[in-house]
């Protein structure tokens, strides 16, 4: 049996995240952060993943609406394998570190207490688990 679940909180572009279940193999596709929302409202609805943990996470590319909450997802499901291209690993890490800076500034300037979702140290820790895959 195959099921496809949209974990995105909204129907517009942003917080892209999907669960593909194929005969019990559970794959999360992307883990984005919505660019026009703040705090928890910017995240996918990870609670829809359900009781069974995902087996793997696949990131399509390094735009924040596809990778922005990956460290949050990894924290919830540390055993899930994380796959992406080598270029996505490199650019994604830089994008996510910049995101920490932006979230930290928003917490200070706008009082958004949910931010930051993760720290630079936490990001570096989870990034060690990323598995770069050849493109093509």
Label each region the model flagged.
Residues 7, 29, 133:
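Hydrophobic residues at beta-strand termini and immediately following loops
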Residues 127-135:
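Short acidic-hydrophobic, aromatic-tinged amphipathic segments that line or gate anion-handling sites
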Residues 10-14:
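A short catalytic or substrate-binding loop motif that flags glycine-/basic-rich loops and adjacent residues
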Residues 9, 87, 134-135:
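Residues that form or immediately flank small-molecule/cofactor binding pockets and catalytic motifs
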Residues 4, 82, 129-130:
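Generic structural signal for residues in well-ordered beta-strands
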Residues 4-5, 61:
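N-terminal amphipathic, basic-rich helices that act as targeting or association modules
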Residues 1-4, 26:
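Extreme N-terminal starter segment of soluble prokaryotic enzymes
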Residues 15, 22-59, 63-64, 68-80, ...:
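Pre-active-site segment of Zn-dependent metallo-hydrolases
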